[in-house]
């Protein structure tokens, strides 16, 4: 059903600055964008832009109502999943009990058909399904990102979150264990995508059951990417990657250099 993660969406109070950051840091190319009418994604309306780097994409959204947004941060907003046939997928997901924010998909400026889930049926977090146009976008010369491996979420109950993905998206638990932040984590694969679920050391401190936490970008070789990233002003939390509970090598960016948003490079096991 889900073929890949098309993009992570971010809220920003300054769209031009956010575009410039991706251009400078990841050699990204602006693929399109424009004004957005008030709607489910941004109730106040605003404007957006899509940036591409390697085989990855990000959607940047600048709302009219910027209450609670920091001028220094990218705030994770949603994840978009690619499906082959959006109408067939809507029928299948509706049969599983999911609801959507509109009766039918809309078409964005890039020609993508997309439809948001009603977040009341997705643990309060925003997700949408996307059908790409027949003419696939070519990868650009940005940072050599192969794909987005997962979106990460902080959750109040790891067991309940795992069960939700297994039951609703026919997921399978890949593995997990103690997290470096002092809690526990788990990786769940569903279709051809993955999610990382992180239960903090003090789950009661969370206000919501699910909160978007980070994105993981797959690269062919982390050490060779470090120098490329550092030449663009990015820094990392360590000199070398660590290996997580499912055999992935992971290295996080310092959030001081990634506009306050948590991102990491990932080298998948052979």
What are these language model-derived features?
Residues 8, 29, 33, 79-82, ...:
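Tandem-repeat architecture and repeat-register "anchor" residues
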């Amino acid at each position: 059903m889900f073929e890949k993660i098309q993009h992570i969406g971010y809220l920003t109070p300054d769209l031009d600055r956010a575009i410039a950051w991706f251009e400078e840091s990841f050699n990204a190319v602006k693929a399109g964008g424009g004004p957005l009418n008030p709607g489910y994604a941004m109730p106040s309306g605003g404007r957006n832009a899509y940036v591409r780097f390697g085989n990855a994409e990000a959607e940047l959204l600048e709302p009219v109502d910027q209450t609670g947004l920091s001028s220094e941060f990218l705030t994770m907003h949603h994840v978009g999943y690619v499906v082959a046939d959006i109408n067939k997928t809507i029928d299948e997901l509706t049969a599983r009990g999911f609801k959507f924010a509109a009766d039918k998909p809309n078409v964005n400026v890039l020609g993508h058909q997309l439809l948001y889930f009603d977040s009341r049926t997705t643990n309060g977090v925003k997700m949408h399904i996307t059908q790409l146009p027949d003419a696939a976008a070519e990868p650009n010369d940005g940072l050599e990102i192969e794909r987005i491996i997962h979106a990460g979420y902080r959750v109040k109950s790891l067991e309940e979150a795992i069960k939700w993905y297994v039951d609703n998206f026919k997921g399978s638990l890949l593995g997990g264990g103690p997290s470096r932040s002092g809690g526990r984590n788990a990786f769940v694969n569903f279709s051809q995508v993955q999610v990382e679920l992180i239960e903090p050391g003090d789950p009661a401190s969370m206000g919501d059951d699910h909160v978007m936490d980070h994105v993981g970008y797959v690269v062919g070789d982390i050490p060779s990417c470090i120098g490329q990233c550092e030449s663009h002003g990015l820094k990392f939390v360590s000199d070398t990657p660590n290996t997580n509970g499912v055999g992935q090598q992971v290295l996080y960016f310092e959030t001081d250099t990634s506009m306050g948003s948590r991102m990491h490079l990932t080298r998948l096991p052979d």
